[in-house]
């Protein structure tokens, strides 16, 4: 099998509007399409960074909570590359987004920081 790339990551939101605001206003993604799926009582938004499809947000009635601490099995976190980590962290601070201290990757020497989306999904910003 030859894979080309990761197409997108799907995120189920406990509060669709709050998550949509976070992924657009905090992370700067743009919604290029949004649909209500009546049979599933579910909203779906396709979120892009530039022209690249990255995150698919879903709403479902009463989704069960999923553990998101780093040691849980399954998806650990989402990572986004940034040109200037200090500037990105300043933006998080200006929007009152709590984050961990900036750390340095011992293998690459690059800096990174973790914070969470509204449902506690860990998000990492990693410097280019």
Outline where the language-model segments fall.
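N-terminal beta-strand motif that seeds the catalytic metal site of vicinal oxygen chelate
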Residues: 1-17, 75-78
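Exposed loop/turn and edge beta-strand positions of beta-sandwich/beta-sheet ligand-binding modules
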Residues: 5, 41-43, 74, 109
């Amino acid at each position: 099998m030859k894979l080309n790339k990761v197409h997108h990551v799907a995120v189920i939101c406990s509060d669709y509007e709050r998550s949509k605001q976070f992924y657009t206003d905090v992370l700067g993604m743009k919604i290029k399409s949004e649909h209500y799926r009546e049979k599933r009582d579910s909203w779906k938004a396709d979120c892009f960074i530039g022209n690249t499809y990255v995150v698919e947000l879903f709403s479902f009635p009463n989704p069960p909570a999923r553990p998101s601490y780093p040691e849980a099995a399954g998806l650990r976190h989402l990572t986004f590359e940034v040109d200037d980590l200090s500037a990105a962290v300043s933006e998080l601070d200006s929007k009152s987004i709590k984050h961990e201290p900036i750390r340095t990757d011992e293998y690459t020497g690059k800096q990174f920081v973790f914070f969470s989306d509204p449902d506690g999904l860990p998000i990492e910003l990693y410097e280019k």
